[in-house]
Amino acid sequence: QYLMAMRYGVEFTLGRQAAAEDILALRPDQVILATGSRSGQPPWLDDEWAMSGLIPSAREMAADLLERHDVTEGRAVLVDQDHSEMTYAIAQLLAKRFTAVTIVTSRERIGHDVSLINRQGIYQRLHDLGVEILCNVEPVSLAALEDAQLQLRNVYSGATQMIKNVAAVTHASSRIPNNALQAPLEEAGLEVI
């Protein structure tokens, strides 16, 4: 794609973050805004916990874990609301850095948005690594985290259960587009795609 774009005269400026002024200075006819996304804050994660940084997004945790090679005693809990290949690659990384891993999802299975053949491979790899998978549940309270426990609630029956020996909690949540440039560009009269 890069080579084809170059062939058709697309100019790339890499290694810097563009501001609206940078884009406007180029006097474009249209702007294709492809600025990525960030993880949203799941409903079970209140603002205080979110601001503390103690329950990072799976992307944030993966970046941290890639810098380390030690193994942490205890269970990492990955709350899966994303259901993409990225989530399960991070679960595999967690299995290398923690003595136990549990994936929690409110859906009836993991990998809901992944093709069947890929999902089968994901299940095989996760089970080979001893990853526990809990379906139809979601976190209901973070109050017991100080005691290394996470309370879950069944989304159908309301029955609760505890995960014990919790050393870390992370979430793979819906993504929110990084579209801060959209409004200033549209206000300047540009068509933003």
Label for each model-derived stretch:
Residues 13-26, 31-48, 52-114, 146, ...:
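Rossmann-like dinucleotide/flavin-binding elements
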Residues 1-25, 114-140:
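N-terminal Rossmann-like dinucleotide/flavin-binding domain of flavoprotein oxidoreductases
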